[in-house]
């Protein structure tokens, strides 16, 4: 089939069909956020999922972006600037995908940079995440161990490995290397690409993990019935442990990771090393935490538990 005709034929896909293809290429968390963004754009009548892509050839993207950024109230609730920028980012990312999908028949949206009408601008310098000290997370882990030994191990991996919760819940037995005290984390990047981040953990933590998994196969962390763990289960047990340990701070997986990042920075670990193991994209991203409170080589993080 003629290549040009093949890519033109994709113009007869509906926006709904194209969005499903696009979302399937994204990491789980990004997919969830952008799926919500697509629903928002449909509600705002920026997108009509029943129409075919050939309608997008004549789209005035600047008008669509202006409509998104001009919104002040949605469903009776105020719309924050952060929310508007997130929806605009979703729209731009989707049109870039359509550009690739149709090999240029549909032009991608370009962020507006007109004075007073800029699509993206810095809202805040710091990530709105509280943090706790090493002493506090030690007390928290003692309580969490009694609530759920499984989630106690998850929490310690978050802190020592500077990992996100979904990266830990997706671990399988073949990712554990007890002989070398290493765990290999699969990190989803854009375009459905994946990199491996091998991290060395303290022997004591790996021994606890080895005793927990025994001789099982499949996922490392599972529910009592053997099914995958929902993030809400972990968050719930964290909440119980925080109450039992009389913590005044709400402890979430995000708070633990942010606390570990700040602690490593305070220890004097180089920014480049922290960025490499945490997968933060820039020093600016790292600074937003520390100011608030392919394959990779093996990362040796100082023991901070």
UniProtKB/Swiss-Prot annotation:
Keywords: DNA integration, DNA recombination, DNA-binding, Plasmid, Viral genome integration, Virus entry into host cell
Secretion signal, residue range per the UniProt entry: none
Annotated ranges, domain Tyr recombinase: 127-303
GO biological process: DNA integration; DNA recombination; establishment of integrated proviral latency; symbiont entry into host cell; viral genome integration into host DNA
Gene3D superfamilies according to UniProt: Intergrase catalytic core
Gene Ontology molecular functions: DNA binding
Superkingdom of source: Bacteria
Domain Core-binding (CB) per the UniProt entry, residue ranges: 13-99
Family designation: Belongs to the 'phage' integrase family.
Name this protein carries in UniProt: Virulence plasmid integrase pGP7-D
Native source organism of the sequence: Chlamydia muridarum (strain MoPn / Nigg)
Native organism taxonomy: Bacteria, Pseudomonadati, Chlamydiota, Chlamydiia, Chlamydiales
């Amino acid at each position: 089939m003629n290549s040009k005709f093949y890519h033109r034929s994709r113009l007869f896909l509906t926006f709904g069909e194209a969005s499903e293809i696009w979302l399937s290429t994204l990491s789980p968390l990004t997919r969830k956020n952008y799926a919500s963004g697509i629903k928002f754009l449909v509600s705002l009548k920026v997108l009509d999922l029943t129409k075919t892509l050939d309608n997008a050839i004549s789209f005035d993207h600047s008008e669509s972006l202006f409509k998104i950024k001009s919104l002040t109230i949605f469903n009776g609730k105020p719309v924050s600037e952060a929310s508007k920028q997130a929806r605009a980012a979703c729209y731009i990312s989707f049109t870039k995908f359509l550009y690739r999908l149709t090999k240029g028949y549909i032009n991608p949206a370009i962020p507006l940079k007109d004075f007073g009408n800029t699509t993206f601008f810095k809202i805040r310098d710091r990530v709105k995440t509280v943090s706790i000290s090493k002493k506090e997370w030690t007390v928290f882990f003692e309580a969490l161990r009694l609530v759920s030994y499984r989630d106690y191990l998850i929490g310690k991996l978050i802190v020592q490995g500077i990992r996100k919760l979904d990266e830990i819940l997706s671990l399988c037995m073949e990712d554990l290397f007890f002989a070398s005290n290493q765990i290999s984390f699969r990190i989803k990047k854009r375009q459905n690409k994946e990199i491996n981040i091998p991290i060395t953990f303290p022997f004591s933590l790996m021994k606890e993990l080895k005793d927990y998994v025994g001789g099982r196969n499949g996922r490392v962390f599972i529910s009592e019935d053997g099914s995958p763990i929902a993030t809400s289960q972990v968050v719930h047990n964290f909440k119980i442990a925080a109450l039992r340990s009389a913590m005044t701070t709400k402890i979430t997986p995000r708070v633990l990771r942010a606390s570990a990042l700040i602690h490593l920075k305070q220890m004097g670990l180089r920014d480049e090393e922290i960025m490499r193991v945490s997968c933060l994209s820039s020093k600016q991203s790292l600074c937003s935490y520390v100011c608030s409170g392919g394959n990779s080589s093996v990362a040796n993080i100082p023991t901070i538990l």
